[in-house]
Amino acid sequence: SHRLPRGEVAAILEILKPALVVGGEPDWNAPKSVPQNFVPEGVSDEPLDRPVARYWKAMTSGGSTGRPKIILDHLPAVTDTAVAAPLNMQPGVKLLNPGPLYHNAPFIVSHYALFAGGSVTGMAKFDAEEALRLIDAHRLEWVNFVPTMMHRIWSLPEEVRNRYDVSSLKTVFHMAAPMPAWLKEKWI
């Protein structure tokens, strides 16, 4: 996250020793970095080699010590797009990602959508009415909420909720916390 304190970023970079950092501050101690707003001078049409990273993701966790920890997914960086099928994520899906990509679920579902040839509409910060507006404006089909987000949307005045057409949604997925039965019933 761009909001991490510099000390935490330094600790994460020290633990991971990344080959490349995309974005970030110019003074970060990274062997190679691509600065924000980078535009290459030229792009080749030549096919690229297909290197596979050793790990497909490395998520951070504060843990109980106060020092950042890295949770490595030891699977290789290849994805079978068929894994998205049980999530009802069809090829070409239009997904709303209301959560930060440094959390596991938003990271995974956004990647599955992109790997399936879909598009991702992200939110810089969750806002209940803005989520409804984006679903309406972009005819989004799939979203992963946490119960708190669903509660905030349901807590909007009925006239605000009804202002937006969300009939394009095919899947509303939730995880990360228990869902109160009454809230799930309202959403169904």
Question: What are these model-predicted stretches?
Answer:
Residues D80-K94, Y102-W142, L156:
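Conserved AMP-binding/adenylation subdomain of ANL enzymes
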Residues S1, G99-H103:
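Conserved AMP-binding
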Residues A58-T65, P178:
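Conserved helicase ATPase motor motifs in RecA-like P-loop NTPase domains
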Residues V52, W56-K57, K69-P91, H151-S155:
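Conserved structural elements of the adenylate-forming
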Residues V9, D27-S33, I70, P106-I108, ...:
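Short glycine-/acidic-enriched loop or helix-start segments at secondary-structure transitions
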Residues R3-L4, G24-P26, A53, F126-D127, ...:
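Short beta->alpha linker loops
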Residues S1-P51:
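Structural core segment of the AMP-binding/adenylate-forming
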